[in-house]
Amino acid sequence: MKIKDLIKNKALPSFCTANFDVIESIFYYCNINKLPCLIECTSNQVNQDGGYTSNTPKLFVNKINNLRKKIKLKQSQLFLGGDHLGPLPWKNNTNKIALKKSVKLINSFLNEKFDKIHVDTSIKCKNDKSINNEIIFDRTCKILSSTIIKKKINDKFLVIGTEVPLSGSNDDKKVIITSIKKIKIEALNFKNFLESLHLKKKNFWFSH
């Protein structure tokens, strides 16, 4: 089954970690209980430069597969995801450099057959005075419209967006619980924003 089918059928928890002791425990549990398993790594954990775990996507997948075989978890039970793929690891560079590296990052995940791709371009780069939904959307369009990405992304479970707090920690270091009312307001605002962009950028939507 594909990720969306599993979610629709019941639910599919995502374990976002690059810690192989944790992953080993998850594999054992899923194998014993015959459950599907989605393991995700973030762009600052695993990327083409190695990330803070010193793992490229290729190396990460090789380690995952070796561990899977050791525990005898079926290949059909395992799904891999890339989380917050975008400029996060290179936010201290200009947006031009960070986006170029983001394309290379996502392409490296696609080349290793990751099933779930989460594109997040909401991070402010070195030369960004501010960032808003329009900028985030334009950057996402540029990445997904890239020739090397466009041909490989269609059969993936694609997630676009960000979350609270921003990936990489909350800037003001405060823990805030978002109310249901605020979530509904933000969801409506984003829905209206997407509808307005749909009218302005039809070519992008119709080609994806």
Regions found by a protein language model. Name each.
Residues 1-72, 76-77, 89:
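Alpha/beta catalytic barrel-like cores
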Residues 9-21, 81-103, 173-181:
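Active-site mouth loops of central-metabolism enzymes
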Residues 11-17, 37-41, 76-84, 115-121, ...:
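Hydrophobic faces of well-ordered beta-strands that scaffold small-molecule active sites
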Residues 17-22, 51-63, 90-108, 135-143:
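Glycine-rich anion/phosphate-binding loops
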Residues 45-49, 84-92, 121-134, 157-181, ...:
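Active-site-proximal beta-alpha loop/turn segments in soluble metabolic enzymes
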Residues 54-82, 132-156:
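Alpha-helix-loop-beta-strand connector modules within alpha/beta enzyme cores
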Residues 136-147, 178-194:
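Acidic, His- and aromatic-enriched active-site or binding-groove loops in soluble protein domains
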Residues 163, 189-208:
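Membrane-embedded hairpin module used as a gating/binding unit in multi-pass transport
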